[in-house]
Amino acid sequence: MRNGLILGALAAVVITQAGCGTQVKSVALQPSVQQPAAGSGVALYFGSQTHPAVQQQLGEASVSARVARAQDGADASCDKALEQALDKLRAAAQEKKANAVINVQTRFHSAETSSSTNFTCGVSPSAAAVAVHGDLAVLQSN
Protein backbone atom coordinates (compact mmCIF):
# COMPACT_ATOMS: atom_id res chain seq x y z
CA MET A 1 0.00 0.00 0.00
CA ARG A 2 2.77 2.42 1.01
CA ASN A 3 4.74 1.68 -2.19
CA GLY A 4 1.62 2.32 -4.25
CA LEU A 5 1.19 5.76 -2.65
CA ILE A 6 4.83 6.66 -3.26
CA LEU A 7 4.66 5.52 -6.89
CA GLY A 8 1.38 7.41 -7.37
CA ALA A 9 2.89 10.61 -5.94
CA LEU A 10 5.99 10.21 -8.11
CA ALA A 11 3.85 9.66 -11.21
CA ALA A 12 1.83 12.80 -10.41
CA VAL A 13 5.02 14.88 -10.17
CA VAL A 14 6.33 13.52 -13.47
CA ILE A 15 3.04 14.17 -15.26
CA THR A 16 2.74 17.75 -13.97
CA GLN A 17 6.32 18.57 -14.95
CA ALA A 18 6.17 17.09 -18.45
CA GLY A 19 6.36 19.76 -21.13
CA CYS A 20 7.47 22.51 -18.74
CA GLY A 21 10.97 22.87 -20.18
CA THR A 22 12.36 25.83 -21.98
CA GLN A 23 12.56 25.63 -25.76
CA VAL A 24 15.38 27.38 -27.64
CA LYS A 25 13.99 28.99 -30.80
CA SER A 26 15.40 30.72 -33.83
CA VAL A 27 13.03 33.58 -34.65
CA ALA A 28 13.05 35.86 -37.71
CA LEU A 29 14.26 39.41 -37.04
CA GLN A 30 11.67 42.06 -37.78
CA PRO A 31 13.12 44.71 -40.15
CA SER A 32 12.16 47.50 -37.74
CA VAL A 33 14.56 46.36 -34.98
CA GLN A 34 17.62 47.43 -36.96
CA GLN A 35 16.46 51.03 -37.40
CA PRO A 36 17.45 53.61 -34.78
CA ALA A 37 14.78 53.86 -32.10
CA ALA A 38 12.98 57.18 -31.91
CA GLY A 39 15.27 59.68 -30.22
CA SER A 40 18.17 57.27 -29.72
CA GLY A 41 20.07 57.72 -32.99
CA VAL A 42 21.73 54.33 -32.43
CA ALA A 43 21.68 51.95 -35.40
CA LEU A 44 22.07 48.19 -34.97
CA TYR A 45 23.98 45.89 -37.32
CA PHE A 46 23.43 42.18 -36.71
CA GLY A 47 26.09 39.59 -37.45
CA SER A 48 28.35 40.51 -40.35
CA GLN A 49 25.86 42.98 -41.80
CA THR A 50 27.59 45.77 -43.74
CA HIS A 51 27.81 49.19 -42.13
CA PRO A 52 29.62 52.50 -42.68
CA ALA A 53 33.31 52.69 -41.75
CA VAL A 54 34.14 52.64 -38.05
CA GLN A 55 35.66 55.89 -36.80
CA GLN A 56 36.08 54.73 -33.22
CA GLN A 57 35.54 51.51 -31.23
CA LEU A 58 34.10 52.18 -27.77
CA GLY A 59 34.07 48.69 -26.24
CA GLU A 60 31.44 46.01 -25.92
CA ALA A 61 28.05 45.75 -24.26
CA SER A 62 26.01 42.74 -23.16
CA VAL A 63 22.44 42.93 -21.91
CA SER A 64 19.53 40.57 -21.45
CA ALA A 65 15.79 40.70 -21.05
CA ARG A 66 13.11 38.37 -19.78
CA VAL A 67 9.39 38.98 -20.30
CA ALA A 68 6.27 37.16 -19.21
CA ARG A 69 4.90 35.04 -22.01
CA ALA A 70 1.80 36.56 -23.52
CA GLN A 71 -1.19 34.82 -25.06
CA ASP A 72 -0.14 35.88 -28.57
CA GLY A 73 2.41 33.07 -28.94
CA ALA A 74 6.05 32.19 -28.41
CA ASP A 75 7.42 34.22 -31.34
CA ALA A 76 5.60 37.38 -30.22
CA SER A 77 6.95 36.92 -26.69
CA CYS A 78 10.47 36.48 -28.09
CA ASP A 79 10.01 39.65 -30.16
CA LYS A 80 9.07 41.56 -26.98
CA ALA A 81 12.08 40.20 -25.09
CA LEU A 82 14.37 41.17 -27.99
CA GLU A 83 12.83 44.66 -28.14
CA GLN A 84 13.53 45.19 -24.43
CA ALA A 85 17.09 43.88 -24.74
CA LEU A 86 17.78 46.11 -27.75
CA ASP A 87 16.43 49.14 -25.87
CA LYS A 88 18.96 48.38 -23.12
CA LEU A 89 21.73 47.90 -25.71
CA ARG A 90 20.91 51.24 -27.34
CA ALA A 91 20.95 52.92 -23.90
CA ALA A 92 24.41 51.46 -23.23
CA ALA A 93 25.58 52.79 -26.60
CA GLN A 94 24.19 56.27 -25.90
CA GLU A 95 25.91 56.29 -22.52
CA LYS A 96 29.27 55.77 -24.27
CA LYS A 97 28.38 58.27 -27.05
CA ALA A 98 28.21 55.57 -29.74
CA ASN A 99 25.96 55.98 -32.76
CA ALA A 100 25.84 52.25 -33.58
CA VAL A 101 26.21 48.75 -32.25
CA ILE A 102 27.90 46.42 -34.73
CA ASN A 103 28.44 42.64 -34.76
CA VAL A 104 25.25 42.15 -32.72
CA GLN A 105 24.80 38.57 -31.54
CA THR A 106 21.93 36.98 -29.67
CA ARG A 107 21.96 33.99 -27.37
CA PHE A 108 20.07 31.93 -24.86
CA HIS A 109 22.41 30.04 -22.53
CA SER A 110 24.91 28.33 -24.85
CA ALA A 111 22.85 28.63 -28.06
CA GLU A 112 24.23 31.67 -29.92
CA THR A 113 23.31 33.32 -33.21
CA SER A 114 25.36 35.79 -35.20
CA SER A 115 22.83 36.28 -37.99
CA SER A 116 21.39 39.27 -39.80
CA THR A 117 18.04 37.50 -40.33
CA ASN A 118 17.32 35.48 -37.15
CA PHE A 119 17.82 35.67 -33.40
CA THR A 120 17.99 33.07 -30.65
CA CYS A 121 15.43 33.11 -27.85
CA GLY A 122 14.50 30.83 -24.99
CA VAL A 123 10.79 30.42 -24.36
CA SER A 124 8.94 28.49 -21.67
CA PRO A 125 5.25 28.29 -20.84
CA SER A 126 5.72 31.31 -18.55
CA ALA A 127 8.44 33.54 -20.09
CA ALA A 128 10.71 34.41 -23.00
CA ALA A 129 14.34 35.47 -22.62
CA VAL A 130 17.21 36.63 -24.81
CA ALA A 131 20.72 37.99 -24.27
CA VAL A 132 22.28 40.45 -26.73
CA HIS A 133 25.95 41.35 -27.23
CA GLY A 134 27.61 43.83 -29.58
CA ASP A 135 30.48 46.21 -30.23
CA LEU A 136 29.82 49.88 -29.50
CA ALA A 137 31.11 52.14 -32.26
CA VAL A 138 31.04 55.57 -33.78
CA LEU A 139 30.42 55.13 -37.50
CA GLN A 140 31.14 57.63 -40.23
CA SER A 141 28.04 59.49 -41.27
CA ASN A 142 27.18 59.72 -44.95
Name each region found by the language model.
Residues E112-S124:
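Charged, often glycine-rich, active-site loop that binds/positions anionic groups
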Residues I15-G19:
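C-terminal motif of bacterial Sec signal peptides marking the signal peptidase cleavage site
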